[in-house]
């Protein structure tokens, strides 16, 4: 008897595939920074409003992820890092991803406006548009400054959280925006240093592809030098304090040490050890952002006991 095997037929999408479509790792950062923005605002927010606000912000983040995955299907199919995502792997159809993204976008924006306020909903709508259209459809494929300008999309969540609580913006919410905005380039350029071939194969004009690794290393250092004083200065805003200052000094000292190491690295050495330093800097940058926002949250938690703030 002949053994007939049928290959190339995509498996039916399951619950986990639809969760992956929403980019849960990115969503976790969005939820955390938005939650910090909401909780440290100088007003009392009803727990139900806070819960629903964060829920719809998370939904908006997931919608952005689905729209991005729909548009980037051709790129994601080529890149090793992304080829197993639901859309490029064929598990979820592109049209289905588009429909889910649009539906969740509408639900998230409308419900956030009804549950909290129109300003917060407007910020969320702009964030989804900026990420899905300005970044994904335009910047990502046209300029090596894609993540510099596009980084604004990931920087809005704490502002949205603050707006849920207060209905507006402030120096503090703008600082949280700026912290993420300035953090984004060194974070993603360190990734691009050891993923250059992926971006090159997909035709994405990352800085490593258009200008080479040596220029990218210099940019990591320059943006780290700009980020460090900004991060430390946050200690002297209304959401800062001695705990945040100590945390920021330690983290930014380590950031600068790492950035200098990356800048001074010889390419032959980096290839020989498979970009060990660059991968370490990339992982550290994730902890860097979470710990800064954790310190901001800790300052707010300590204030009722007379321990937080100055």
Swiss-Prot record:
Pathway(s): Porphyrin-containing compound metabolism; heme O biosynthesis; heme O from protoheme: step 1/1
Protein name per the record: Protoheme IX farnesyltransferase
CDD domains, alphabetized: PT_UbiA_Cox10
Catalytic activity, as annotated: heme b + (2E,6E)-farnesyl diphosphate + H2O = Fe(II)-heme o + diphosphate
EC number: 2.5.1.141
Membrane topology: Multi-pass membrane protein
Gene Ontology, cellular component aspect: plasma membrane
Top enzyme category: transferase
Localization per Swiss-Prot or TrEMBL: Cell inner membrane
Gene3D superfamilies named in the record: UbiA prenyltransferase (1.10.357.140)
GO molecular function, one term: protoheme IX farnesyltransferase activity
Keywords: Cell inner membrane, Cell membrane, Heme biosynthesis, Membrane, Transferase, Transmembrane, Transmembrane helix
Assembly description: Interacts with CtaA.
TM segment ranges: 26-45, 49-71, 95-115, 118-138, 147-167, 174-194, 220-240, 243-263, 289-309
Gene: ctaB
Main subcellular location of this protein, as a coarse class: membrane
Alphabetical list of PROSITE patterns matching this protein: UBIA
Entry similarity comment: Belongs to the UbiA prenyltransferase family. Protoheme IX farnesyltransferase subfamily.
PANTHER family in the record: 4-HYDROXYBENZOATE SOLANESYLTRANSFERASE, PROTOHEME IX FARNESYLTRANSFERASE, MITOCHONDRIAL
